[in-house]
C-alpha cells in the first residue's frame, strides 16, 4: 500500500489494486507478511506489482521472469502484456527469446555493449538468414560446445 500512496494513488485505490494484483499472482495469503519473509520469486512478483501499481506509461524491466518456472513465467508475461495492450511502452532485458517474440515490436541484440542487431523481429531474423531467435542468440553469444565462435 505504501508504494501506491507514494505514487499518488488514493488509499482506497491503492488497497484495491494491491489486492487485485496479489490475487492475480496467487499471493493473497501472504498479504500481511513482510517482504523479507517471502521467497525470492514471491519478492520478484511483489516488485513487479510495485512497478505497475499506478499504471505507468513506460515499464522498464530487467529480466522480469528470471528464475521462474514456465507457469509463473507465463503468468508474469500475461501481466506485462496486459499493460502493453493498455498502452504502456515496455522496455525489458531478457535472455528468453520467446518473450521477445511475444512482446516486442522491435529488439536490440547486445553483446559486450555492442549492438549486433536492431529492428523488428522479422528484420533481425532476415539479417541472420531466417534463423529462429534462439538460433540467433546462440550464434551471437556462442554456446557451451563452441564458446569461442564469433559472428
Feature locations, PLM:
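Catalytic Walker B motif of ABC-type/P-loop ATPase nucleotide-binding domains
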Residues: 59-62
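A short, surface-exposed alpha-helical micro-motif characterized by mixed small hydrophobic
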Residues: 100-102
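ABC ATPase "signature
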Residues: 118-119
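Conserved ABC ATPase signature
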Residues: 34-38
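Conserved ABC ATPase "signature" region
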Residues: 1, 5, 10-30
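Helical segment within the ABC ATPase nucleotide-binding domain
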Residues: 74-86
Amino acid at each position: 500500500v505504501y508504494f501506491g500512496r507514494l505514487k499518488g494513488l488514493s488509499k482506497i485505490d491503492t488497497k484495491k489494486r494491491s489486492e487485485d494484483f496479489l490475487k492475480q499472482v496467487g499471493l493473497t495469503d501472504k498479504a500481511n507478511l513482510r517482504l523479507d519473509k517471502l521467497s525470492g520469486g514471491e519478492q520478484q512478483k511483489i516488485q513487479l506489482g510495485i512497478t505497475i501499481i499506478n499504471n505507468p506509461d513506460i515499464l522498464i524491466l530487467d529480466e522480469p521472469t528470471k528464475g521462474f518456472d514456465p507457469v509463473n513465467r507465463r503468468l508474469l508475461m500475461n501481466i506485462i502484456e496486459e499493460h502493453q495492450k493498455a498502452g504502456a511502452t515496455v522496455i525489458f532485458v531478457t535472455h528468453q527469446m520467446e518473450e521477445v517474440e511475444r512482446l516486442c515490436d522491435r529488439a536490440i541484440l547486445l553483446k559486450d555493449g555492442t549492438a549486433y542487431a536492431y529492428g523488428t523481429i522479422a528484420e533481425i531474423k532476415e539479417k541472420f538468414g531466417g534463423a529462429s531467435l534462439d538460433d540467433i542468440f546462440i550464434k551471437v553469444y556462442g554456446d557451451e560446445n563452441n564458446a569461442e565462435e564469433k559472428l
